């Protein structure tokens, strides 16, 4: 149900494209393509989850496309689509965990459609003499650079599960941090 992309950078090394970068490429292409075809309408909207890069918000803002932020999970993206049926046109949405939904027919992340879309984007980039890596650099130049680093923490066994349960209770209660260093 998800898509992962790897491409070569100018040094010939393999570059893993993370979920936020993938969503950025999808949104960039959808907007640029609709503009080129004269199909971008004031009623069009995008959806991203609250954990997804704000670079997408910048793309939407600069192109006068409504962007909706929702909770994490595709059920929330599907909810936004349902709330707008017959009133507005959903043109894409996703989250940083590599899920994307490029149209409104399926109400969950759709890897087959995303695979078709990234192939179309790669062909579009190639027609311009560019690679997917080049396209990502173009996005950064136009909308600003963003960087992230994911850290996975594993807490094994029953003691780990108990520790995670306590951490979550603390975050939900009055022990939640007031500042982040």
Question: Residue spans of the language-model regions?
Answer:
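Phosphate-binding and adjacent anionic-ligand microenvironments
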Residues: 5-15, 33, 37-181
């Amino acid at each position: 149900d998800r898509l992962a992309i790897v491409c070569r950078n100018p040094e010939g090394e393999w570059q893993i494209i993370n979920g936020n970068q993938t969503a950025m490429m999808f949104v960039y292409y959808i907007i640029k393509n609709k503009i080129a075809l004269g199909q971008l309408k004031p009623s069009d909207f995008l959806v991203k989850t609250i954990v997804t890069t704000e670079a997408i918000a910048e793309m939407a803002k600069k192109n006068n496309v409504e962007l909706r932020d929702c909770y994490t999970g595709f059920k929330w993206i599907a909810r936004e689509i349902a709330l707008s049926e017959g009133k507005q046109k959903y043109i894409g949405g996703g989250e940083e965990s590599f899920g994307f939904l490029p149209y409104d027919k399926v109400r969950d992340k759709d890897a087959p459609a995303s695979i078709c879309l990234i192939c179309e984007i790669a062909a579009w980039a190639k027609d311009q003499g560019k690679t997917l890596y080049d396209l990502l650099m173009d996005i950064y130049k136009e909308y600003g650079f963003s960087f992230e680093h994911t850290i996975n923490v594993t807490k094994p066994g029953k003691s780990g599960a108990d520790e995670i349960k306590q951490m979550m209770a603390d975050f939900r209660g009055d022990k939640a941090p007031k500042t982040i260093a």
